């Protein structure tokens, strides 16, 4: 390397010849030496792809690279390969090249494995949070907030920083309570935060302090409780709307489950009734109708943990607040239930409204068999225990189930008939219009079950029953039309046949 550099400085070797004309003229000879370096086997340290990327850099970025090499912030070809291997867009590359902290800590010849930023931390035995790819995608880095914002010091200086005074003492690595206050220095300051995102709230710390997580961490000093980096990460913090963010909707269950699905972490924590806090929530959620929608089908409208429990003020919904959580999405069901007789009964027994019938984390898709009044049926089992003197309830539940069953059966029958009529070339649009009305009425009827009122339910079901009648009438008309077409076709074929016979006989007569 030294011999090559000497030749370059002496002008004995043309720079372009060393890199296939991919290194622009004017590049500092020291930088060229790194770009063209070879390992002991003679293989180029900087791959062609990274050389091509270097050649695409604008003058400003090449000058910053020249300066980094001249100041010996970038000292080796391996170090340069790491920087170029990121292949960042110009804005991010400029931020990186002006951050001596990140540059120095990505030098494998200077840093220990524990302190080395690299493109593959596991390969170097470094912690996962030392991934340089995460650093350059971090929301703080992209906003121009450098390492010094948390660690202290001056990122434009090579050394001489004062982060030792600003960064918490080593013993704080065993006490995580300081982290929330540390992050709150900025995130609780509206004036500071509004420079970057005016819509971002600044009350996270205030909410966290009073939450079960906050009380466990700050009052009980139990480090098993999560703090900011438990959910958001360390150097790879991304906006919640970024699919790679740990708090992106589809990743929230995994993030919460890191603690709540770990028996060791959750050992000793109890519910309000004194029972142990379960660790089955994540598995139950994944199998639930909500989990399948969010994780299976990618429906971001489906709720994750934080939609029901909250974020920084996360807490288990109490009996009185469960319905309010559910009503954020299921507003019609909640409104109907509030006006029903069941509302008072649930209040009297101190039952959580929605979860009493549907469950919480293991919510399965609601089905009509839930209305069964026999043994094992949801309605039947509850009413046998709590409403033995109300036989009209059983009659109402049976009516609900029978009516919905008849409409559902009619829907399936009409779909099959409609497809057969379409295959015969008949116009089925009027029938399908009534099918749409029936489908809407069926959905509405299932919602109106939550009124637990026969009269209210009948109002929702009536349009569906009428749609069945109208559709059946149109089906009969279509069948009659098809029969008429068949008769007409047969008559036409017969007429044509007779005509052909007559012509044949006439031709025979003429031949004679």
Label for each model-derived stretch:
Residues 1-4:
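Positively charged n-region of N-terminal signal peptides that target proteins for export
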Residues 6-16:
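Bacterial N-terminal signal peptides
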Residues 20-501:
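Short sequence/structural segments immediately N-terminal
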Residues 497-512:
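Juxtamembrane interface at the cytosolic side of transmembrane helices
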């Amino acid at each position: 390397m030294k011999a090559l550099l000497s030749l370059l400085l002496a002008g004995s070797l043309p720079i372009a010849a060393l890199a296939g004309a991919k290194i622009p003229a004017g590049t500092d000879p020291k930088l060229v030496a790194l770009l063209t370096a070879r390992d002991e086997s003679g293989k180029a340290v900087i791959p062609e792809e990274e050389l091509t990327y270097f050649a695409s850099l604008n003058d400003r970025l090449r000058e910053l690279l020249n300066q980094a090499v001249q100041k010996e912030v970038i000292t080796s070809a391996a170090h340069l390969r790491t920087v170029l291997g990121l292949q960042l867009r110009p804005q991010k590359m400029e931020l990186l090249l002006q951050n001596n902290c990140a540059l120095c800590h990505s030098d494998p010849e200077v840093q220990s494995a524990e302190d080395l930023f690299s493109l593959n931390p596991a390969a170097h035995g470094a912690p996962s949070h030392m991934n340089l790819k995460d650093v350059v995608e971090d929301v703080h880095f992209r906003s121009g907030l450098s390492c010094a914002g948390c660690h202290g010091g001056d990122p434009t200086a090579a050394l001489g920083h004062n982060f030792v005074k600003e960064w918490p003492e080593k013993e704080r690595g065993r006490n995580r309570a300081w982290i929330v206050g540390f992050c709150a220095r900025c995130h609780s300051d509206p004036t500071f935060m509004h420079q970057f995102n005016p819509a971002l709230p600044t009350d996270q710390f205030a909410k966290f302090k009073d939450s079960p997580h906050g009380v466990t961490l700050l009052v009980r000093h139990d480090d098993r409780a999560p703090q900011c980096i438990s959910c958001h990460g360390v150097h790879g913090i991304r906006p919640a709307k970024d699919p790679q963010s740990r708090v992106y909707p589809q990743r929230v269950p995994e993030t919460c489950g890191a603690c709540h699905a770990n028996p060791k972490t959750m050992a000793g924590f109890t519910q309000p009734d004194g029972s142990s806090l379960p660790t089955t929530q994540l598995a139950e959620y994944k199998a639930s109708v909500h989990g399948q929608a969010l994780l299976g089908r990618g429906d971001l409208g489906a709720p994750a943990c934080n939609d029901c429990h909250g974020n920084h003020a996360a807490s288990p919904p109490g009996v009185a607040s469960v319905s309010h959580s559910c009503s954020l999405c299921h507003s019609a069901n909640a409104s109907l239930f509030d006006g029903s007789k069941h509302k008072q009964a649930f209040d009297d027994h101190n039952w959580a409204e929605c979860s009493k019938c549907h469950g919480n984390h293991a919510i399965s898709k609601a089905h009509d068999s839930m209305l069964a009044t026999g043994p094992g049926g949801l309605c039947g089992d509850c009413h046998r225990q709590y409403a033995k003197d109300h036989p009209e309830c059983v009659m109402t539940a049976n009516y609900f189930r029978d009516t919905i069953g008849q409409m559902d059966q009619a829907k399936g029958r009409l779909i099959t008939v409609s497809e057969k009529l379409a295959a015969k070339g008949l116009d089925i649009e009027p029938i399908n219009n009534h099918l749409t009305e029936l489908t809407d009425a069926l959905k509405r009827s299932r919602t109106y079950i939550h009124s637990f009122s026969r009269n209210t339910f009948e109002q929702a079901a009536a349009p569906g029953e009428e749609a069945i009648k109208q559709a059946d009438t149109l089906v009969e008309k279509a069948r009659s039309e098809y029969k008429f077409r068949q008769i007409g076709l047969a008559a036409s074929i017969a007429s044509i046949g007779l005509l052909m016979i007559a012509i044949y006989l006439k031709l025979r007569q003429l031949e004679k």
